[in-house]
Structures are given as C-alpha cells and as structure tokens.
Amino acid sequence: MEDLCVANTLFALNLFKHLAKASPTQNLFLSPWSISSTMAMVYMGSRGSTEDQMAKVLQFNEVGANAVTPMTPENFTSCGFMQQIQKGSYPDAILQAQAADKIHSSFRSLSSAINASTGNYLLESVNKLFGEKSASFREEYIRLCQKYYSSEPQAVDFLECAEEARKKINSWVKTQTKGKIPNLLPEGSVDGDTRMVLVNAVYFKGKWKTPFEKKLNGLYPFRVNSAQRTPVQMMYLREKLNIGYIEDLKAQILELPYAGDVSMFLLLPDEIADVSTGLELLESEITYDKLNKWTSKDKMAEDEVEVYIPQFKLEEHYELRSILRSMGMEDAFNKGRANFSGMSERNDLFLSEVFHQAMVDVNEEGTEAAAGTGGVMTGRTGHGGPQFVADHPFLFLIMHKITNCILFFGRFSSP
C-alpha cells in the first residue's frame, strides 16, 4: 500500500501541474486519489500499449515493480492471463498478474484505511464506469471490479439513445450524492459515437481538531494579484500548530489538522511578485521529494501561530480527456487504438471522457459551540509568535496522515 501512496502522490502532482498550466489564474480543486482509483478500474481491463500508457501516467509502475508475491489460484483467472500463457509468454504473464493484483489489492486496502475514520469527517465518493450496452462486459471483469472496487460497470444505450443515457447517468449521480451533483454530464457531452465514460464525484467536509473562532467582523481584502483586491470573510485561529518555511521559495507551510487522521497543508508565498497569482514558482518547483521534505518533522516545528485564512467553498468540474492525453494516455481515448479486450470480448470500447467533480467546504466548523469572539485581522496583543496570513493566493492539500495519501489538491486564487 505504501508503494501505491507514492504512485498516487506522483500522479497528483503531475496532474495538478498540467491543470495549473492550462488554467494559470483560476481556482483549482480535485481529488487525485479518487481519480486514480476510478481510472484503475478502467486500467484493469486494458491491454497492450493502452495498458502501458495508463500505467505510466498513473505511476502504477511504482506499485507493480516490487510485486514478488507467489501466485494464488484465483489470480490465474485474471482477465487475459490464460490467453498470454497460450501465446507462450508464461513467465511474463505471471509477473504481470502479480503486479496487477498488487495494484488493485493496494487500492482496496487504501480505500479501507481512508474510510475507516470517516466518523470524524465526511468523505463521499461516487465512481462508475458506463459502457455501450452492445459491448457486453466480460463476467470475469465484472467480478474483479466487485472484488477490488466494490463497484461494477453499467451498460447504457449510447448508440441509439445517447441523451436518455446522459440523463440516466446524471440521475444516478444525483441520487448517489444526495442531490449535491444534479448535472455532472452537461448537454452534448455524449452522443451516438460515445462508447465508454467514467464518472467520478467526491465531496469533503471535515471538522477542525481546534475550531476557528467565529468569523472576524467585517470583510477583508484578498489580494488576487498585485493590482486587484476582492473582499472576503476571514477566519481566525490562535493555536499550537506545525509550521515551516521554505527558504528558497520564500513561502510558508502550515498544517491545520482535522479531527481524525486528516490534515490540510497550506503553502503560502510571502508576497505576490507580479500581476498573476504569485504561485508560479511554487507550482513549478513542487515535487514528490520536495513535498515530503517540506512536510517532514525536520522542516516543520510546533509553534503558537496566529492563522488568518478565508472562508471558502470550492466546487470544480473537469473533463479530463485532453489533460490525460497530454500526460501520455493517448490510446485509451483513441477509437482505432484503444485495447480494452480485458473488459469486452468484442474489444470495440474506447474511453470517450472522464468526468470529475470535487467539492470542499472550508469554514470555522464547530465554532458555534466554542468560546471565542471576532476581532481585528492584525495586531493581536501579547503574541510574539509567527503569523500565517492567507490574504493572497495559496496552494493547499488535504492528506490522510496514516497512509500519506493526498486526498485533495487545490489552488485558491480568487474568492
């Protein structure tokens, strides 16, 4: 499972950088873990170069590389395994089946670990693969989806009734999200040429370990860039927290723990250097190794910190086909080259689109029951410790501390 968390972080950072480049000044919020786990269900049915490209983009080679566990009898029934043996690639088939089993077993274990403590926070994720009904999913593929992901693909009639299929998918998502997401697939997003779409929606709402005080009186200016100001409702907290400073990037990093095993990490540049968000250097420099270093106990120390962050709610919708293709996942979206023979004997499926929607509430949750009053934004008396004043764009990530898995990654650049 540790290897999978490394893979997910690598994928998260790469995906975020591609989205950030495509939308340099907009708010961003996504769940790389949720996207990766949903894509893994598709990956399980891929073969050939389609499989290789998906593994590379999703960083699954980081997981399968160390798979040395003995084969168990049920693994021998994996989709496509017997076909490979018949082609004379017996040793390769065993290694591939071992690696695949490790990937999907790790996702099952990771999901169990993340969902184990959801009594302290709300994490709702909806994942589903919808395929053209004429394709006929393999029974073995359906069984493995149920085994590893507690889900299964659903057949719909894209060919003859695309609009009806879209409404059916939206109705299913709306029901699963208790009405939070009523229209995940917009009009015109599917048609008679659609063969397979992947839907993924996730919502997070956590309770802070130490609640913020009630909202500060009045609105405060949020510096969108060096020239633009937007009024925003700020929240205040004075608490012992882990805080660090990234010297070469001139940025602070702060950990805000939620109740349970989840924390939010905020990365805040000292100042805005130009007319954009001021996050360009931070976004270009962030890597897996650097993030591990920045969030380590060696670089972060507990101190009594005064924290000012805006109250915000993000609800972001993405159609990820173009981004995933730019990352190297070409064949899966190509009608002529896609190989999903592990899903369907006819092998005429290709991925038309990946729809992802993520939502988060960041507020003073729990303050109504806490003693505390509002106040001014600076100049609190009797405090000589550091301040963390997020009155300009910042990056944030929500991490499951037990597994070090990034559940969400975001950029807040404009209220």
UniProtKB/Swiss-Prot annotation:
InterPro entries noted in UniProt: PAI-2, Serpin_CS, Serpin_dom, Serpin_fam, Serpin_sf, Serpin_sf_1, Serpin_sf_2
Sugar-bearing residue positions: 75, 115, 339
Domain of life of the native organism: Eukaryota
Localization per record: Cytoplasm; Secreted, Extracellular space
Entry-linked Pfam families: Serpin
Gene3D superfamilies: Alpha-1-antitrypsin, domain 1, Antithrombin, subunit I, domain 2
GO CC terms: cornified envelope; cytoplasm; extracellular region; extracellular space; plasma membrane
Disulfide bonds: 5-405
Keywords: Cytoplasm, Disulfide bond, Glycoprotein, Plasminogen activation, Protease inhibitor, Secreted, Serine protease inhibitor, Signal
Function: Inhibits urokinase-type plasminogen activator. The monocyte derived PAI-2 is distinct from the endothelial cell-derived PAI-1.
Family label: Belongs to the serpin family. Ov-serpin subfamily.
Binding partners and assembly: Interacts with PSMB1.
Protein name: Plasminogen activator inhibitor 2
Source organism per UniProt: Homo sapiens
